[in-house]
Each structure stands twice: as C-alpha cells, then as structure tokens.
C-alpha cells in the first residue's frame, strides 16, 4: 500500500498576538510627546479589523507606523493587513479601518494551485474552503511544492501546516 503525504497551505493571523501588538502601540501612543493632547487611539475588539482614529492624516500615519512596528515585533506579517480609505470622523478627527485577512480567497487559492500545476511537480493541489491541500507520494515533491509557493508572488502571508502521512 503506497503512502500518501500531504500538507495544507493556510493564511491566518494570531488574534492574541494582534491584541498584544495593539496594546503595546496604545501604550506607546499614550507616552509619546508628539501625541500629547491628541485624540489618537486604536480600537480592536477581537474582530478581524482594527480601527485607527487620529487628529489628522499626519498623526494617523504615525499611528500606522507605530502599529506596524509592534505587529512586526509580534511576528505578524504586514501582508495580512488591508487598509481602508481614510475618512472624516466626529470631532475633527480622521478614521481608517484596517482589515485582517483570514483564510485564502478563491482567486488567490486558484493562483496557488495553478503555480503548483505549472511547475510540473508530481503533487496534487486542491482548494478546500479557505485553504489549499497539497498531496503527493514523495516528501521531496512536497518540499518542491513549498518552494514553488514561496516563490510565487502572493498578496497574503501563507503558512504550511498539518503535515500528514496517510
């Protein structure tokens, strides 16, 4: 009986690490001199979005820089962030919503499957909901498939999980 090896390609963000990064960013905003008297704040309620509020575009850009630096330190890939439009909010402030990408969208999943099939590696790739399953007989072929995916230009961070031998 031949053994089948497989792994999953997923895109997910650790919400606890995002919460930690947001708390660190808020602490820095509270203590920084250039934010004294500012209405700048970050709102994160364990939904896959972060709301940034600040006095003006310049301070909003600084809030984004602080948040991004804290996310990087916590191991969150910035490709997982989708920035919305900057819009006016109440009290002469500006607001921007940042969405956290969870799961692989259909068009990106198809791009991953196509890249693997075009590489002529002897594996099968299939879309399963918001992840891609790659299976093959040889572990070396799976490693080649991982390298193909890493070499493909994607708009999202990907992880390789759930290695199995069936």
UniProtKB/Swiss-Prot annotation:
Say if the entry is tagged with keyword Lipid metabolism.
Answer: no
Could you state one GO cellular component term attached to this entry?
A: cytosol
**Record-linked Pfam families:** DUF520
Q: What are the entry keywords?
A: Nucleotide-binding
What molecular functions are annotated in GO for this chain?
nucleotide binding
Q: Which NCBIfam families match?
A: PRK05412.1 (NF003819)
**What is known about what this protein does?**
Nucleotide-binding protein.
The protein here is known as Nucleotide-binding protein Dred_1927
Q: What is the lineage of its organism?
A: Bacteria, Bacillati, Bacillota, Clostridia, Eubacteriales
